[in-house]
């Protein structure tokens, strides 16, 4: 007989799903796919099943990191209105259950990556999850205003892992993708921190606007935005992307600088930069895939 799933069961499933930080997972997964596709169009090949498994493992590993982060940050999540609706502060999931859930997903994702893909990808995935869950969440976030800068490396690993899943090595191309996300992270999160500086201060988190003030934060946002703009052109200069990427990256970068300058002039416009930065990363990495596909297609025709 079929058993009807109760409303309580569905709410529990939704709560566990929320622990994974699905919006973050979607962006992480997309950047990982970009790394894998770029490796493929660069002449490296791997079985489709292993590549698909790698992307799945990266998504699960990212979700595990999100769950472990929510476990450790449950005290400050309850203080901040932006995070107070998360499953643990709401009492939908116990801290112990969240911890076990995160650790199990972490172990399974790394083990499957090791068995079905390759050792390098498994090592990189384990480092990325550890970096975010322990180095950033436990040691950096509550201790230094540079938490986002140093901790930003965790979110920059996925395209490198995607590349390694196909190529089985770390190429210059994947390092540039890593650097793009690394430099994207500070202006993205500091824009949000400008909006919620009062809540961060109340929670005891030394975000840059809290420790150094609004003016210094706006200057840092602008500086990192300039560095991001320059770095986004590197793929074309290093000849692993073509003219299509160059044109789109240049335009996207100019718009990013426009929003960053607006924030520098008026911090109240910080959320426009925050929302655009998410769109920026999706479009930039999307055009990586498009450009690589177009270049390969043209090469076959010539």
Curated annotation (Swiss-Prot):
State the superkingdom: Bacteria
List the pathway annotation: Porphyrin-containing compound metabolism; heme O biosynthesis; heme O from protoheme: step 1/1
One of its GO biological process terms is: heme O biosynthetic process
Q: Name one GO cellular component term.
A: plasma membrane
Transmembrane spans: 24-44, 48-68, 97-117, 120-140, 147-167, 174-194, 221-241, 245-265, 282-302
The EC number on file is 2.5.1.141
Q: Which Pfam families does the UniProt record give?
A: UbiA
- Which reaction does this enzyme catalyse, per its entry? heme b + (2E,6E)-farnesyl diphosphate + H2O = Fe(II)-heme o + diphosphate
Gene Ontology MF: a single term: protoheme IX farnesyltransferase activity
Q: Does the keyword Transferase apply?
A: yes
Q: What class of enzyme is it?
A: transferase
Localization per Swiss-Prot or TrEMBL: Cell inner membrane
The record's section on HAMAP family has: CyoE_CtaB (MF_00154)
Q: What else is known?
A: Carbon 2 of the heme B porphyrin ring is defined according to the Fischer nomenclature.
| Family the UniProt entry places it in | Belongs to the UbiA prenyltransferase family. Protoheme IX farnesyltransferase subfamily.
Describe the function of this protein. Answer: Converts heme B (protoheme IX) to heme O by substitution of the vinyl group on carbon 2 of heme B porphyrin ring with a hydroxyethyl farnesyl side group.
What name does the UniProt record give this protein? Protoheme IX farnesyltransferase
Report the source organism. Answer: Neorickettsia sennetsu (strain ATCC VR-367 / Miyayama)
Instruction: Please spell out the taxonomic lineage of the organism that makes this protein.
Output: Bacteria, Pseudomonadati, Pseudomonadota, Alphaproteobacteria, Rickettsiales
Tell me what gene encodes this: ctaB
């Amino acid at each position: 007989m079929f058993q009807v799933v109760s409303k309580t069961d569905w709410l529990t499933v939704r709560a566990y799903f929320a622990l994974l930080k699905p919006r973050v997972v979607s962006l992480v997964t997309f950047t990982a796919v970009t790394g894998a596709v770029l490796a493929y169009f660069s002449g490296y090949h791997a079985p489709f099943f292993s590549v698909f498994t790698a992307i799945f493992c990266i998504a699960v590993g990212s979700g595990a990191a999100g769950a472990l982060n929510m476990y450790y940050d449950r005290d400050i999540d309850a203080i901040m209105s932006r995070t107070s609706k998360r499953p643990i502060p709401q009492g939908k999931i116990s801290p112990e259950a969240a911890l076990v859930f995160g650790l199990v997903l972490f172990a399974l994702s790394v083990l499957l990556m090791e068995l079905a893909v390759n050792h390098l990808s498994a090592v990189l995935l384990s480092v990325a999850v550890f970096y975010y869950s322990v180095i950033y969440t436990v040691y950096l976030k509550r201790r230094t205003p540079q938490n986002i800068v140093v901790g930003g490396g965790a979110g920059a690993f996925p395209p490198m892992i995607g590349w390694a899943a196909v190529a089985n090595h770390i190429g210059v191309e994947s390092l540039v993708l890593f650097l793009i996300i690394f430099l994207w992270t500070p202006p993205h999160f500091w824009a949000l921190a400008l909006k919620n500086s009062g809540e961060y201060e109340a929670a005891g988190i030394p975000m840059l606007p809290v420790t150094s003030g609004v003016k210094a934060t706006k200057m840092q946002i602008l500086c990192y935005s300039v560095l991001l703009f320059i770095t986004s052109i590197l793929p074309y200069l290093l000849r692993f992307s073509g003219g299509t990427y160059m044109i789109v990256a240049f335009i996207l970068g100019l718009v990013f600088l426009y929003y960053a300058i607006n924030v520098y002039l008026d911090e109240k416009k910080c959320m426009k930069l925050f929302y655009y930065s998410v769109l920026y990363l999706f479009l930039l990495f999307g055009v990586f895939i498009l450009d690589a596909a177009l270049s390969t297609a043209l090469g076959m025709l010539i």
